[in-house]
C-alpha cells in the first residue's frame, strides 16, 4: 500500500509580517501582497501608525488616508493560459514574467524588492494595473496598458501611479467628450412629434452611458441586474478603510531658539479584513493612498470670478438648471491667473453645489503649507491627477518621502497544506 501523501488537513497558517513603508502624496502604492490558493480562507488585522514627514510649518490641513484590500485571481491576468497551466500540472509551461529595470526600488510600487534577475511575476504587475484601471482613474481616462514595469517613468515605478484629487468643481469635471448641443435633422418643414420623443430617448440613454455607465457593470445595474467581478475581470474590493491623519505642533525644535516649531502628524490606524473565502488561486493586494484636500491659494468662487452675472448664473432657477446643457468654462473662471485656454465642462449650476476653500493672500508668498500655489496647467488629465511635487515644499525632509508608516499585518490563512514536518519526512 502506498504511503504517498495526497492531501492535507485544513489548518491555520500564521502569515503575519511587518511593513516599513514610505510613499508620496497622491500616489497609489502597494503595501502588502499575499499569494493565496483556491480553498483558502484569508483574514487580516493590520495595526500601524502613519506619519507625515516633518512639516516646515505648523499643521494646517489634515490628510485623508485610504487603505484598500483587493483580491485578484490569476485567471484574470493569464486568461486561458492559466486554465491550461492548471490542467497540465507539473508538465505545464512556466508562467510568463515581466521586465523591470536594474534599480532596487523600481518595483517598490508593487510592494516588493526588485530581484537581481530584473524580472517579476506578471500577475503582480498586471494585477496592480487592473486595480488602478478599475478603481483609481477617472472612467474617461485611457487605461494604463504598459506591458512591463521598465516602460514606466521613475516616479511611477518607485511610488505608484498618480490618483485623482478629492472632488471639487475643477478636479471632477464632466468627461471631455461631453456634448454641449445635439441637433435633430428633419426632412420636411413639419416636425414628427413621435420622432422628437425618440430623439429625446436616444439622447437620454447616450448621456446615461457617457456620465454614469462607462463600465459594463454599471450598464447592467441600470437594468436592475448585477454582474459578478468575474464578468469584466474586475479585481474584487474586499475591504476599504478611511481615516484622517491628524497631528500637533511641536514647540522648541531648535536648541538655540525655542521659538521655532514644526508640525508633526502621527495617526494610529487599524485595517481589518474579515475572513474571506478564496475561490481560486490569486493574490491579495493591500494598497495605500494619502491625499490632502485640494486647497489652492488662488481659487475663486465661480460667481465672484465671472463678473457681470446673468439671470441664469445667479438665480438658481430649477427649470433652467434641470434642463440646460452642460456649461464649458476655463481655469480662468475659477482661478486668478488661470489659463483661459484650459477648458473643462461642468453641470449647469455646479457652483451652487460646491464651495471653494479660501486662503488669505498673506499665505501666498509663504512656503511650507500644503496649498496648491499655482493654477494647475496641462491637459485635463494632468490637471485632475495629483502632482506630489506640489507638496515638496511642505516638508523639512523627504528622506522617508512625504509619508511613512510602520505596520504589523496580522494575517491568518486557513489552507489545505501539509505541515513542515510532513514536507520534510517525504514518503
UniProtKB/Swiss-Prot annotation:
Give the function comment from the record: Assembles to form an icosahedral capsid with a T=1 symmetry, about 30 nm in diameter, and consisting of 60 capsid proteins F. Upon virus binding to host cell, one of the spikes dissociates from the capsid and the virus interacts with LPS through the exposed EF loops on the F proteins. After the genome had been ejected, the channel formed by the F proteins at the unique fivefold axis remains open.
Localization in the cell: Virion
Query: What gene is this protein a product of?
Result: F
Q: Where is it mainly found?
A: virion
Any GO BP? symbiont entry into host cell
Stored SUPFAM superfamilies: ssDNA viruses
The organism's superkingdom is given as Viruses
Has keyword Cell cycle?
no
The family note in this entry says: Belongs to the microviridae F protein family.
Per the record, what is one GO cellular component? T=1 icosahedral viral capsid
Pfam families, A to Z:
Phage_F (PF02305)
Keywords of the record, alphabetical order, are: Capsid protein, T=1 icosahedral capsid protein, Viral genome ejection through host cell envelope, Viral penetration into host cytoplasm, Virion, Virus entry into host cell
* Assembly behavior: Pentamerizes and interacts with H protein, G and B pentamers to form 12S pre-assembly complex. By binding with protein D, induces joining of twelve 12S complex to form the procapsid. The procapsid has an external scaffold made of 240 copies of protein D, 60 copies of the internally located B protein, and contains 60 copies of each of the viral structural proteins F and G. Upon genome packaging, interacts with protein J. The mature virion is composed of 60 copies each of the F, G, and J proteins, and 12 copies of the H protein.
Give the Gene Ontology MF terms in alphabetical order: structural molecule activity
> Under what name is this protein listed?
Capsid protein F
Amino acid at each position: 500500500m502506498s504511503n504517498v501523501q495526497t492531501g492535507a488537513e485544513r489548518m491555520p497558517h500564521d502569515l503575519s509580517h511587518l511593513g516599513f513603508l514610505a510613499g508620496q502624496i497622491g500616489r497609489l502604492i502597494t503595501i502588502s501582497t499575499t499569494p493565496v490558493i483556491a480553498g483558502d480562507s484569508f483574514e487580516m488585522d493590520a495595526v500601524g501608525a502613519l506619519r507625515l514627514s516633518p512639516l516646515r510649518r505648523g499643521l494646517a490641513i489634515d490628510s485623508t488616508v485610504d487603505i484598500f484590500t483587493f483580491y485578484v485571481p490569476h485567471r484574470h491576468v493569464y486568461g486561458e493560459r492559466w486554465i491550461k497551466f492548471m490542467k497540465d500540472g507539473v508538465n505545464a509551461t512556466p508562467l510568463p514574467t515581466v521586465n523591470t529595470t536594474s534599480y532596487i526600488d523600481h518595483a517598490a510600487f508593487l510592494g516588493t524588492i526588485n530581484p537581481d534577475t530584473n524580472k517579476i511575476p506578471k500577475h503582480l504587475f498586471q494585477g496592480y494595473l487592473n486595480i488602478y484601471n478599475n478603481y483609481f482613474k477617472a472612467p474617461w481616462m485611457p487605461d494604463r496598458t504598459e506591458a512591463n514595469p521598465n516602460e514606466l517613468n521613475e516616479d511611477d515605478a518607485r511610488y505608484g501611479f498618480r490618483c485623482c484629487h478629492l472632488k471639487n468643481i475643477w478636479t471632477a469635471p464632466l468627461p471631455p467628450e461631453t456634448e454641449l448641443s445635439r441637433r435633430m435633422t428633419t426632412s420636411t418643414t413639419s416636425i414628427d412629434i413621435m420622432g422628437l420623443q425618440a430623439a429625446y430617448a436616444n439622447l437620454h440613454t447616450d448621456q446615461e452611458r457617457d456620465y454614469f455607465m462607462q463600465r459594463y457593470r454599471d450598464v447592467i445595474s441600470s437594468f436592475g441586474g448585477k454582474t459578478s467581478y468575474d464578468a469584466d475581470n474586475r479585481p474584487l474590493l474586499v475591504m476599504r478603510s478611511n481615516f484622517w491623519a491628524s497631528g500637533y505642533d511641536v514647540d522648541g525644535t531648535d536648541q538655540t531658539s525655542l521659538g521655532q516649531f514644526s508640525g508633526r502628524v502621527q495617526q494610529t490606524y487599524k485595517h481589518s479584513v474579515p475572513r474571506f473565502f478564496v475561490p481560486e488561486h490569486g493574490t491579495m493586494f493591500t494598497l495605500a493612498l494619502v491625499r490632502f484636500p485640494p486647497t489652492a491659494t488662488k481659487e475663486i468662487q465661480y460667481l465672484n470670478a465671472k463678473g457681470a452675472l446673468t439671470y441664469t448664473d445667479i438665480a438658481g432657477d430649477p427649470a433652467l438648471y434641470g434642463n440646460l446643457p452642460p456649461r464649458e468654462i476655463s481655469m480662468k473662471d475659477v482661478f486668478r491667473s488661470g489659463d483661459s485656454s484650459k477648458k473643462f465642462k461642468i453641470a449647469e449650476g455646479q457652483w451652487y453645489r460646491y464651495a471653494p476653500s479660501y486662503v488669505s493672500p498673506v499665505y501666498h508668498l509663504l512656503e511650507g503649507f500644503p496649498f496648491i500655489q499655482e493654477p494647475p496647467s496641462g491637459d485635463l488629465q494632468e490637471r485632475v491627477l495629483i502632482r506630489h511635487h506640489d507638496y515638496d515644499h511642505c516638508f523639512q525632509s523627504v528622506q522617508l518621502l512625504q509619508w511613512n508608516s510602520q505596520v504589523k499585518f496580522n494575517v491568518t490563512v486557513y489552507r489545505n497544506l501539509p505541515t513542515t514536518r510532513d514536507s520534510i519526512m517525504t514518503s
